[in-house]
Amino acid sequence: MSSSKSHSRRPWWSTLGIYVGLSLAAFIMVIPLLFSFVMAFKSPQDFASHSPFALPSPPSLASFQAILTGRVNFGDAIITTLLVVVVMVVGQLVSSVLAAYAFARIEFPGREVIFWLFLGTMMIPASVLVIPLYLMMAKMGLNNTFWGIVLPFVFASPYAVFLLRQSFRQIPQEIIDAATMDGAGQMRILFSIVVPVSKPIISTLVLITVVSQWNSFMWPRIIAATRPRVLTVATAALQSQYNANWTYVMAATTIALVPLIALFIVFQRHIVESIALTGIK
């Protein structure tokens, strides 16, 4: 028995190699973030007269002040992005939960066919839909408007529906039957039993949706190139307005990164739980 344990034990040099490899990968990923953060606190004069890798001396908020009060109007871009994210998260989450519950727990003709057809839309590249969606929004007079940005993508996501359906199907049928016998309707079962049990996967989907919409560039750039701008489009506009003044661009990048890092820290436990549950199931 002891010999089998010793054979199954990983050699120390193998464990050391794994940790060294992971540390190196983490270092490579963190370096660009640190570089961006350091440059954001340099004044344009400091950046021009010193190495890009030198620490700011002294740290300056000039770049932040410039982008928040300049012609790009970065403050409005922050507000617009927050509104887009909130509307997208609420719209996608509510519609995805309802659709997933219907596909998982409600019997109706053609349920499996409709589900797989809906899931098949994941295979369609987003770039293929850009021109049809733009023409539809333009016909409705929604180009260069807030609703033009959110309307095409505010409803159920196939990816979210698939994950939620798999999670909902893991709930024992006996619990659903007991709630039905007690007089609970479908909506009460959904929001009193199914949703609370599925909190880890829902939290993960919220984080994925927030990150996806916060970083969205192609569609907002096409449908609302001038106004209203989101953070990514406003950051790109900084390069042309200020002749690629990199301290301004890095200040904008820092503003965009901080909320995502904070969100990850808050939702980290739920993400780990979701991954663990997915692995068990």
Task: Label every PLM stretch briefly.
Residues 6-10, 15-281:
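A structural signal for multi-pass alpha-helical bundles of membrane permease subunits
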Residues 1-5:
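ABC-family P-loop ATPase nucleotide-binding domain
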